Regions:
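Gly/Ser/Thr-enriched, mixed-charge loops and adjacent short helices
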Residues: 125-256
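N-terminal small/polar loop signature for handling phosphorylated ligands or for N-terminal nucleophile
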Residues: 44, 52, 58-124, 219-256
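Fold-independent oxyanion-binding glycine-rich loops
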Residues: 13, 115-118, 132-133, 208-209
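Glycine-rich, flexible loop/turn motifs
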Residues: 5-6, 11, 19, 123-126, ...
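Gly/Ser/Thr-rich beta-alpha loop segments that engage phosphate groups in nucleotides
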Residues: 16, 64, 93, 128, ...
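An N-terminal, well-structured beta->alpha segment
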Residues: 1-76, 166-204
Length: 256
């Protein structure tokens, strides 16, 4: 019987690993098999927590702009579809947007998976997991890993008949979240002179840090009346807007 050791992939409350070749001495340890088993582990964990059959779950999956994102997303979506989970393929997205897919009523996902490795080198990737309570904590990730390492758990999740009949559904989450950001910016800015375009006359600088967030600068319509919109540095005062925009909170729990 093959033994699995995925504990080395745990980085606090995230999964992080080497997803592609390219750096000497760093072998791939987050490939299709690891992704398959971790995804089934998450589905089982979510089913247990919600006391809900796996085939009744709805899970969204999205990713940042990393080179391995599409392959990992395909593996995750196929894995979930084959065990009967309703899957929303959100494509390019941001971490806060993926959390909000559990909150927006037209999505109402039981859980979400964000494929990202934040600031790590190009050959790395990883997973952030969410439910309606926020980002999973270290203990939750440890439980998912234990399930992923268990053949009894993985093999007990039966493939549904004709899984191709219900493929992953593509959803424009980045557009929906952009609308959400626009509404929050209008609300927080409270510009009585330009209520629908509260940033009119301002010079705004947006720094996406090579991440997916840069697309929101184009999609959030309230930017369009600003003078000389640019990219390259942090948006001053964005903290207040981010807080209002639904950033995912960490669930209380042991983090050490």
């Amino acid at each position: 019987m093959k033994e699995y050791d995925y504990k080395k992939l745990q980085n606090g409350s995230d999964i992080r690993g080497v997803a592609m070749d390219g750096v000497p001495g760093e072998n791939v340890n987050l490939g299709k098999e690891e992704t398959f088993r971790l995804t089934r582990g998450f589905a089982f964990w979510l089913s247990e927590k919600l006391e809900k059959p796996v085939e009744s779950l709805k899970i969204s999956v999205g990713h940042d702009s990393r080179l391995t994102a599409e392959e990992l997303k395909t593996t995750i979506a196929d894995t979930l579809v084959h065990i009967g989970v309703k899957v929303y393929d959100c494509g390019l997205a941001s971490t806060p947007a993926m959390f909000m897919s559990t909150i927006f009523p037209e999505y109402a996902c039981d859980g979400a998976i964000m494929i990202t490795a934040s600031h790590l080198p190009f050959n790395r990737n990883g997973f952030k997991y969410f439910d309606k309570d926020g980002g999973l904590n270290k203990a939750d990730i440890s439980a998912i890993i234990a399930y992923a390492e268990s053949d009894a758990v993985i093999e007990n999740l039966e493939t549904v008949p004709n899984p191709g009949a219900n493929p992953a559904e593509k959803r424009d989450l980045i557009g929906r979240y952009s609308q959400h950001l626009r509404e929050k910016i209008i609300s927080e800015a409270a510009n009585t002179e330009h209520p629908d375009k509260p940033l009119t006359g301002l010079k705004i600088v947006v720094d996406a840090g090579n991440g997916a967030g840069g697309f929101y600068a184009e999609n959030a319509e309230c930017w369009h009346e600003c003078k000389q919109p640019k990219t390259g540095a942090a948006l001053r005062g964005a903290g207040k807007i981010q807080k209002a925009a639904g950033r995912p909170l960490r669930r209380a729990g042991p983090q050490a």
